[in-house]
Amino acid sequence: MSHHSNRKVEVRRVDECTTMDELIRHCFPAFGGAFLRRIYTILDQAVGMGCPISVAVAGPVTVSGQHQAWLIPLLETGWIAYISTTDAVCYHDGHRSLTEHKAGPIFEVPIWGDDGALRDERTIRVTDMAFDEDVLLDQDKFLSAVLTHPDFQHKMTGTELRYRLGGIYGRQEQRSGVKPGLLAT
């Protein structure tokens, strides 16, 4: 019994594809293409059947605004039901809500820029996103004050902590007039 299909490798040029489905199914034949097609197929079937998805998210998701571009909309539509993420993602989620920085604390910098010059300017770089060092200092002050509230003065799980922080962040975002962040969603 053969364990392979002998499927002929036929690819299309990307400019010949009109949909994401065609692109994924016909333009990535090797070196991870099979994995990408399999993941795409599973997700396409799950979403098509109405099955909620669980995702693990790391990296500069909230710094770069990806949470507002795709993660929150997928949560709100029910396509994603559960998120596992890092403390850094949750920490950076609060930057835009800070009163002192509501005008937009995060800006783009060259990914291969001069880190020494950025350090001298007191600029923190996260890949190609950056913010003034004061954003971190103000975030620390904000969180330190929040964590002294009575609601935070007992043992709790990380899930409860993030839920409670989400409520605080949500109220702060409303006061600052900024879009809701990940924890407030």
Question: For the regions a protein language model found, what residue spans apply to each?
Answer:
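Metallocofactor- and cofactor-centric catalytic cores in central/energy metabolism, strongly enriched
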Residues: 1-185
